[in-house]
Amino acid sequence: DSLIDTDGKIKTMKYLSFNIDNINAGKILFDFYEKTGDGRYKVAMDTLRKQLAEQPRTSEGGFWHKLIYPHQMWLDGIFMASPYLAQYGNVFKDTTVNADIVNQIKLIARKTYDPKTGLFYHGWDESKTQNWANKETGCSPNFWSRSIGWYAAAVVDVLDYMPVQFEGRDSIMTIINTLAEDIVKYQEPETGVWWQVTDQNNRKGNYLESSASSLFVYFLCKAVNKGYIPVEYKAAAERGFNGLIKQFIKEEPDGSYTITNCCAVAGLGGKGNRDG
């Protein structure tokens, strides 16, 4: 609330950076607006919606991740923008958002999915000019578990707000079932959690990572509870949840709790030419 001034302006937002990460935190504003009716929150929500309306896009309509990352879609961006856009469309009766959301989800799946592993590469560069981009596919070289987790969480969350009769739901349901099938293949059998680099459990420096594991558990639990995937996945979800508690939750001397083994960042490009 302190970040929104009396006119509804988001104080820290640099609008023209077209940073898609700006959008996700706006989801909390729907609750504020519903409970208070304060017009400041509506102005802020409209600003975030306006950013997405003006966000630079790939030739097939995919949101660029940021202005400084031209022609690039990252799995992260689906989580950062699509659930917000879906909720905005539902609350304010903007039905135009649904086709756009489905296109974002399907487009990045089409560009980043690797049938050999059943996993999604972290990012895709349409221009194929980035140091990290495969010169034939434009994909980044690695499978970063948290990015896949963000994508998985996004595809179950958008369905909360998308009309049941909307034809694009079927394609999202297909993606959800593909994700579930492949995510459980990489669940570490002894601990029930997942590796930082999803498919490289024996690689030196790789480790069991808490944020990705949490997102995968969230995805599996919600997809089972909503009936999107067979109930048989409940066992994997429970094994993952128990693994989170056992592997990553640490009680401190003062009685507080810490979540451990959380990756700080694993981006693409920029300083040091990160490869995700």
What are these regions (language model features)?
Residues D5-K9, M13-I20, N24-G26, F32-K35, ...:
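CBM-like carbohydrate-recognition segments
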Residues M73-M80, K93, V97-D100, K135-W150, ...:
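Short, contiguous, pocket-lining structural segments
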Residues T36, Y88-A99, V158-D170, A223-V231:
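Inter-helical turn/loop segments and adjacent helix faces that build the functional surface
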Residues D1-T12, V43-G62, N98-W124, K128-N131, ...:
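Long, well-ordered core segments of solenoidal/helical folds
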Residues L119-S145, A152, V156-M173:
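Surface-exposed beta-loop-beta
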Residues I4-T12, G62-L67, K128-P141, W195-G205, ...:
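Acidic/His metal-coordination segments adjacent to aromatic residues that form catalytic metal sites
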